[in-house]
Amino acid sequence: MKQFIDFIPLILFFIVYKIDPQNVEFAGFNLSGIYGATATLILASVIVYGALWLKHRHLEKSQWFTLGACLVLGGLTLAFHEDTFLKWKAPLVNWLFALAFAGSHFIGDKPMIQRIMGHAIQLPQGLWVRLNIAWVVFFLVCGFANLYVVFTYPNFWVDFKVFGSLGMTLLFLIGQGLFLARHLHDADTGEKPKD
């Protein structure tokens, strides 16, 4: 459910981008296309994460980072009327997540994925390390895929940002689920998990 909530601002961004081709002027700013969608992304992010914070009195670090990147890069996009700032958001966020997951091998006593999921499932330490490395690779691939599409297919990048990123995430989560199911099944049957 958390992943869906995090995608709400992006989905609204996509909808506004697709249905708002006409030229809209507001307070001296052109808010058509990418700029109207960016304003929607910023507003939706503030509302979604604000509501989550009011409900739980807590946001995860990744949510704070995503909100901050949205506000800064989206704000720069609107202020300078230059969409390049927003185009760098997805690669930068993904690469910084990769850095955080990779850094967790050296800082602290557990890999990042174990810190996130360790309360829910038990795995041997070697599997936590492999799973964490898989997340590092996933975030790196997502960042480079976004960057490639942004600068190679500029007319397609918004579609990729929504459907490509979402599709890659779903496929990765399914793969992770299958990987975990195999090892959790080993634990249930009493077999020694494959490390």
Curated annotation (Swiss-Prot):
<keyword id="KW-1003">Cell membrane</keyword>
<feature type="transmembrane region" description="Helical">
    <location>
        <begin position="88"/>
        <end position="108"/>
    </location>
</feature>
<keyword id="KW-0997">Cell inner membrane</keyword>
<dbReference type="Pfam" id="PF04279">
    <property type="entry name" value="IspA"/>
</dbReference>
<feature type="transmembrane region" description="Helical">
    <location>
        <begin position="160"/>
        <end position="180"/>
    </location>
</feature>
<feature type="transmembrane region" description="Helical">
    <location>
        <begin position="65"/>
        <end position="85"/>
    </location>
</feature>
<dbReference type="InterPro" id="IPR006008">
    <property type="entry name" value="YciB"/>
</dbReference>
<dbReference type="GO" id="GO:0005886">
    <property type="term" value="C:plasma membrane"/>
</dbReference>
<comment type="function">
    <text>Plays a role in cell envelope biogenesis, maintenance of cell envelope integrity and membrane homeostasis.</text>
</comment>
<keyword id="KW-1133">Transmembrane helix</keyword>
<feature type="transmembrane region" description="Helical">
    <location>
        <begin position="131"/>
        <end position="151"/>
    </location>
</feature>
<keyword id="KW-0472">Membrane</keyword>
<protein>
    <recommendedName>
        <fullName>Inner membrane-spanning protein YciB</fullName>
    </recommendedName>
</protein>
<feature type="transmembrane region" description="Helical">
    <location>
        <begin position="34"/>
        <end position="54"/>
    </location>
</feature>
<keyword id="KW-0812">Transmembrane</keyword>
<comment type="similarity">
    <text>Belongs to the YciB family.</text>
</comment>
